[in-house]
């Protein structure tokens, strides 16, 4: 391939991937189906269900046009191939053009089928029909969802391509091409998986992501999974009427403090150990009185007379967990990215120390 072809192909590939799996930069620039077609889609707050009936259809059509857009761009990037004249183009490109034209035609056919009889055949409308009373239709269920979505007390989280919304009556997951819906009174929720991620875009602390299986007892409904940060788990439980069960061996760390304590302990473990004199007996931790003292503050971050940290002369009096809780209690909750690098006073003598000065007792 010539250089213009390679350049255009790589650039278009990046654009297509970002347009389908939209990053924050594309949202900020307004390069989304929701923003480009906002005049036709209407307002999500005003009419949640009609908005997503149109949005899912428009998204399917726009994404199906991407191969055709690539072909049209290659007409200029590789003009010597005469792609603008399909009859003279190479056979491989003729097949690609056939595929590029077929995809939008199939999408239009499917969208027309969905929209027939006021969107009754759309997957979202068919799901809502499962919850409709015998004397009413799916539109009555849609009206209920529209009303509850407008309330400010709903729970909403997640990226635009995988949003989780919980209202007083409904549990919903909004994805690129579908909207999953379940009625709260009929669902069983189970935490099936928890994953720890060491990197967070907002702080130096690890992030735990939970996967919750939402299974409805209503006939004909399909279960779906929702994912959220463990720090939002408590807020989700407050909005749900049904309890959430946990699968075996799934540990949920709900608070920022829980995540920090784990990170604090992992950092302390790699610090130099402190050897207790043979004639000194370790006493119970004065913080919890449940375990023996297990840490000693020893200035190891810098030379004794250098820096802000000070030497602590207290004997081992605290366990690792209580020292971590003390360290966290002295931090700004709005600035978790500064916690690990900060300095706090010793809880006993007030000598300032950092995390590098906390040594495990051996």
Curated annotation (Swiss-Prot):
Catalyses which reaction(s): S-ubiquitinyl-[E2 ubiquitin-conjugating enzyme]-L-cysteine + [acceptor protein]-L-lysine = [E2 ubiquitin-conjugating enzyme]-L-cysteine + N(6)-ubiquitinyl-[acceptor protein]-L-lysine
Lumenal topology ranges: 1-6, 78-94
One GO term of the biological process aspect: ubiquitin-dependent protein catabolic process
GO cellular component: endoplasmic reticulum membrane
Listed transmembrane segments: 7-27, 57-77, 95-115
Residues in the Cytoplasmic compartment per record: 28-56, 116-362
EC class (word): transferase
RING-type zinc-finger residues: 285-350
Keyword Metal-binding: yes
GO molecular function: ubiquitin protein ligase activity; zinc ion binding
Subcellular location: Endoplasmic reticulum membrane
Keywords annotated in UniProt: Endoplasmic reticulum, Membrane, Metal-binding, Transferase, Transmembrane, Transmembrane helix, Ubl conjugation pathway, Unfolded protein response, Zinc, Zinc-finger
InterPro entries: TM129
Source organism, top-level taxon: Eukaryota
Family: Belongs to the TMEM129 family.
Subunit text: Integral component of ER-resident dislocation complexes.
Role description: E3 ubiquitin-protein ligase involved in ER-associated protein degradation, preferentially associates with the E2 enzyme UBE2J2. Exploited by viral US11 proteins to mediate HLA class I proteins degradation.
PANTHER family linked to this entry: E3 UBIQUITIN-PROTEIN LIGASE TM129
Protein name: E3 ubiquitin-protein ligase TM129
Organism listed in the record: Mus musculus (Mouse)
């Amino acid at each position: 391939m010539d250089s213009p072809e390679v350049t255009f192909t790589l650039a278009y590939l990046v654009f297509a991937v970002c347009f389908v799996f939209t990053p924050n930069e594309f949202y900020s620039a307004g390069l989304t189906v929701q923003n480009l077609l906002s005049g036709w889609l209407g307002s999500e707050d005003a009419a949640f269900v009609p908005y997503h009936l149109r949005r899912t259809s428009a998204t399917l059509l726009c994404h199906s046009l991407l191969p055709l857009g690539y072909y049209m761009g290659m007409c200029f990037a590789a003009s010597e191939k005469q792609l603008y004249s399909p009859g003279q183009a190479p056979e491989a490109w003729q097949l690609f053009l056939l595929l590029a034209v077929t995809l939008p035609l199939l999408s239009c056919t499917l969208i027309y089928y969905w929209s027939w009889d006021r969107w009754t055949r759309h997957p979202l409308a068919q799901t809502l029909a499962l919850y409709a009373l015998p004397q009413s239709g799916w539109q009555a269920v849609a009206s209920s969802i529209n009303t509850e979505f407008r309330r400010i007390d709903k729970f909403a989280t997640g990226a635009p391509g995988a949003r989780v919304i919980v209202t007083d009556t409904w549990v919903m997951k909004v994805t690129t091409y579908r909207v999953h819906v379940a009625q709260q009174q009929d669902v069983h929720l189970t935490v099936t998986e928890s994953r720890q991620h060491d990197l967070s875009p907002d702080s130096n602390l690890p992030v735990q992501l939970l996967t919750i299986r939402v299974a409805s007892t209503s006939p004909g409904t399909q279960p779906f999974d929702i994912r959220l940060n463990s720090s939002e788990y408590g807020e989700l439980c407050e909005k749900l009427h049904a309890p959430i069960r946990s699968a075996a061996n799934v540990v949920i760390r709900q608070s920022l403090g829980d995540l920090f304590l784990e990170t604090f302990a992992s950092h302390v473990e790699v610090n130099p150990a402190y050897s207790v004199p043979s004639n000194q007996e370790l006493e119970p931790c004065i913080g919890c009185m449940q375990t023996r003292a297990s840490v000693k503050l020893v200035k190891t971050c810098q030379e004794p007379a250098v820096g802000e940290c000070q030497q602590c002369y207290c004997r081992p009096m605290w366990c690792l967990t209580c020292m971590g809780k003390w360290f966290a209690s002295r931090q700004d909750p709005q600035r978790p990215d500064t916690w690990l690098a900060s300095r706090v006073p010793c809880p006993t003598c007030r000598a300032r120390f950092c995390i590098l000065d906390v040594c495990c007792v051996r």
